[in-house]
């Protein structure tokens, strides 16, 4: 089961964080081809702990202060995976979880802007309303990125 999540880079901790979108979100609604989406309210999106959000299907690392192990980012509107096609992000995050040298937070941010948000911006979508899908991580699959598909299907 996939869950809707917002992605945020935390430069103070040099980690990539997910912000779960709770069903109780009462932000400004956004109408699109998939229906009405709401931006998260402060109470619905917490950086501390997400147990109160009652989301199902998230791996144990989703609410970790270190961020998730690996992500599969998908445009919720067109379901087109852009980052996973290059196989860069899963390898980078895998190295970071092992404490190995990897892409810096600044480089990750540039990567997201260049490879992920660019296409969506050209389609006229608002970055602040981007919704992502978490597909899987090392808590679901026990293998190395080089020997298997790092993600489960969302």
UniProtKB/Swiss-Prot annotation:
Keywords: Activation of host NF-kappa-B by virus, Activator, Apoptosis, Host cytoplasm, Host G2/M cell cycle arrest by virus, Host mitochondrion, Host nucleus, Host-virus interaction, Modulation of host cell cycle by virus, Transcription, Transcription regulation. Signal peptide: none annotated. The keyword Transcription regulation applies. GO terms for biological process: DNA-templated transcription; symbiont-mediated activation of host NF-kappaB cascade; symbiont-mediated arrest of host cell cycle during G2/M transition; viral genome replication. It comes from the Viruses. A fraction may be phosphorylated in insect cells and HepG2 cells, a human hepatoblastoma cell line. Phosphorylated in vitro by host protein kinase C or mitogen-activated protein kinase. N-acetylated in insect cells. Its main location: host cell. It is found in: Host cytoplasm; Host nucleus; Host mitochondrion. Residues 68-117 are annotated as: Mitochondrial targeting sequence. GO terms for cellular component: host cell mitochondrion; host cell nucleus. Belongs to the orthohepadnavirus protein X family. May form homodimer. May interact with host CEBPA, CFLAR, CREB1, DDB1, E4F1, HBXIP, HSPD1/HSP60, NFKBIA, POLR2E and SMAD4. Interacts with host SMC5-SMC6 complex and induces its degradation. Interacts with host TRPC4AP; leading to prevent ubiquitination of TRPC4AP. Interacts with host PLSCR1; this interaction promotes ubiquitination and degradation of HBx and impairs HBx-mediated cell proliferation. Multifunctional protein that plays a role in silencing host antiviral defenses and promoting viral transcription. Does not seem to be essential for HBV infection. May be directly involved in development of cirrhosis and liver cancer (hepatocellular carcinoma). Most of cytosolic activities involve modulation of cytosolic calcium. The effect on apoptosis is controversial depending on the cell types in which the studies have been conducted. May induce apoptosis by localizing in mitochondria and causing loss of mitochondrial membrane potential. This is Protein X. The gene is X.
């Amino acid at each position: 089961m996939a869950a809707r999540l917002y992605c945020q880079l935390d430069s103070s901790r040099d980690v990539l964080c997910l912000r779960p979108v709770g069903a109780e979100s009462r932000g400004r609604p956004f109408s699109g081809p998939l229906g009405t989406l709401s931006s998260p309210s402060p109470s619905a999106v917490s950086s501390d702990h997400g147990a109160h959000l009652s989301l199902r299907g998230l791996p144990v690392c989703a609410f970790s202060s270190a961020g998730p192990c690996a992500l599969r980012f998908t445009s919720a509107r067109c379901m087109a995976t852009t980052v996973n096609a290059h196989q860069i992000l899963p390898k980078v995050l895998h190295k970071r979880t092992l404490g190995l040298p990897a892409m810096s937070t600044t480089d990750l941010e540039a990567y997201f802007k260049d490879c992920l948000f660019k296409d969506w911006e050209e389609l006229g979508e608002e970055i602040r309303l981007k919704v992502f899908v978490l597909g899987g991580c090392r808590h679901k699959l026990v293998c190395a990125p080089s020997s298997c598909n790092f993600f489960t299907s969302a």
